Amino acid sequence: MTHKERFFTAIHHEEPDLVPVSAGLDMKFVELLTGKKAAKEMGAHHGGGLEEGRTVSPLEFHEANLENQRLRFEAIQRLGTDLYSVSDYNIYPKDYVPKMLDDRTYVDFWGKIYRLAPEVNTNYWIDGVIKSEEDLDKFVPPDPEEMNYDIVDLAVKLAGDQYPVVGGIHLAGMFPYLIRGGLDKYCRDLYLNPRFARRLTKMVGDVQLKIAINVIDRGVDAISESDDIAGKDGPFYRLPIFKELIFPYIEEMVRICHRHGITYLKHSDGNLYPILDALVALGIDGINPIEPQVMDIADVKKRYGQKVYIQGNVDCTWILPFGTEEDVRRDVRRCIDAAAEGGGFVLSESNSMHPNVKFENILFYVDEARKYGRYPLRR
């Protein structure tokens, strides 16, 4: 089977030749796998082109993103995994470059503020620009028709008919609280100034929905909607808030995906159990990553495996960063034993192959998946 055939067989709840394997690689590992130097990385949130104390042009920033996307494809080929992803973090307005506020701090076109951390080759979110209704009144959101989708076109071209291209997108579940300056502020708004929270959420959701539609129109094979809406203690909001503000965008995106014949994977870290029935009822096709510290992948497979495919959940909090080879291999087997029977399963890490993961553990992860994840499964 090709990688694409393997993926589609699995997500349609049939058994392929092998369990499909996904790995969300930090650029650190892309460099190690390809032996090539990537453009200066901005972590998960942009493809490259920025570094401390240096100004880059829009063209240089864009070309850095495209080159890093090419290297990601070469890396998955060398690693032997099955899914090729492209993120909406690398879709931005034409002639855009993040605005540097100082040598280490920048703001993106959505008003999310990040701090560069060159010592660990990544960045992290710190704030947002919308502090009041007056700020929202003045804010000009990006135009979905004026965005640069070159990176999606490149991914689809490179993948051809061999690899499935998964478009990573965001809707209304996460960007509003990042732009607002924090989940705590956004939650206060929901109760003390709900009109403000609703306006902000609608502004973001409407734009991101149109961006996602444009990504679909460029030929991706699946959508992975990546809004984190829960923590280890449970969902961020009560179910009525989800139903009013967040779920309508998911439901509409599911309809659009199905109209185009592609699948919709819902990603969120944290404990989703309190809202999982409601999420599945929206018509989503898959759930990821089923965080192992707070959710049981075998239980999720048993309860929901006839309706959704399962993607997860080798532990990237402890085992992949700190575990031994046998720890990694054992955790891969745990996931396959729990969820792979009958298809409907894609093996992945429980969030990402972040910079603190040990490189050799990524190799053990894939090797064990290929050895143990051969259908018919061994018991």
PLM feature segments, named:
Residues 1-65, 107-108, 113-122, 130-379:
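Active-site loop segments of alpha/beta catalytic cores
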Residues 13-14, 78-79, 90:
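Acidic, polar-rich N-terminal leader regions of halophilic archaeal proteins
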Residues 68-87, 218:
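Catalytic domains of carbohydrate-active enzymes, especially glycoside hydrolases
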Residues 72, 103, 297:
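Generic structural marker for isolated residues within well-ordered, non-membrane alpha-helices
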Residues 73-74, 90-93, 335:
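Short linear loop/turn motifs
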Residues 88-105:
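Short acidic, Pro/Gly- and aromatic-enriched capping/linker segments at domain boundaries
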